[in-house]
Amino acid sequence: MLDVMKHRAPDDSGIIDDGKFAMGMGRLKILDLDSPNLCPVTDGELVMTYNGEIYNYLELREELTQLGHEFSTESDSEVLLKAYRQWGDLCLDRLNGMFAFAIYDGHQIFLARDLAGEKPLYYRKRAFAFASERKALEGCIEFPPGHYGTYDLQTGHLTLKRWWFPPTKIRGLSLEDAVKELDVLLNSAVQMRTRAHVPYGLYFSGGIDSTLISTYHSFEHRYTYQEKDYKEEFLKVFPKILYHLDLPTTHFSPFGYWKLAEEANKEVKVVLSGEGADELFGGYVRYVPNEFNRQAQQHFPSYKGIFPYTDMMWDEFNGNLRTLLRIGDRMAGAWGLENRCPFLDRRIIEFALALPIEYKIKGFETKIILKELIKKRLPNYEIKEKEGFYVKVNEWIGSKDGFGKTDYMRLQKQLCKKS
């Protein structure tokens, strides 16, 4: 299992087996580069496998030290294990980070995943096992984001519980105050995500999201997808991309993220990106009222549209965003990189979900609060039409009559057969 996933954790690996249960872990070294014996992490009683980063590990370490805990490494993984020992499952509410981890105490296994699903986790009920990628575990299902679970070795029963709940009330604050608060939160999120003992960079498209991130930190390394005719390379490497994705995709973006990660791999081990901004702050064109809604609102002022914006965004957060996170994680992992997303800081997620909808979308205007924030930080910034990392797959394969999702899926099947 570890060998199949070695690409995402190339620096170290190890296995602990007590005869009842075995746990293995690979490591991509980001913090505390010199400490040995961190795969898996153990204190002699608890054993932990862990994928991710706890961004507020320094603050938690200080709190745990005051509670009497001693540390032998500078790693966030040791902080996480001691946080679990101190607070049990309640430690999850103290974590600011992306994570999927499992802790074994000789009798049961505790598993948990971050609230947005940034880090992957899959499990199999029959002959219980878990892994970070589907390819390592036949017959597995996805562990839900924002949940924890306890597997009892004696009974063979797994209990799942939600540990994170979205805010249910809309806050009453002015747009000006909201912009100020987001400014502070985003600054903190970026600073925490640049805590690393290795070089790091930024996926930079020039759009609002990545440009905002760049205003809070001076990034020596920036990576932008270059639009070229990649037809031959696309056809050659796409089977590899599908292998790392584990599943077919209707998105054209994986090749773009593959190229970005390939370039970033030459210089850094960590990249920041703008995932989550569109889903949380209303960045998609489909949020803009269509002509039917526009006419209906003119004639019937009380008409609010067929689909409430808030419900649409929540569906995006739980649907499209998870797909994009899977793509970003797998393409970065394929090149031994770690992808970090400041907009998916827990504080920003909860802030965004509690914002009045008119601070995100109003009429035909999208991402209102982000546009106000970038005006504040970069007064001369020219807001451009959203592009992202656009990959022209339909043009490369010579389709004159359009290239739909069905054609794309058929192409993937053909490429996999040839590889």
Regions found by a protein language model. Name each.
Residues 140, 155, 253, 270-272, ...:
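Adenosyl-5′-phosphate
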Residues 226-261, 265-268, 286-295, 334, ...:
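ATP-dependent adenylate-handling ligase core
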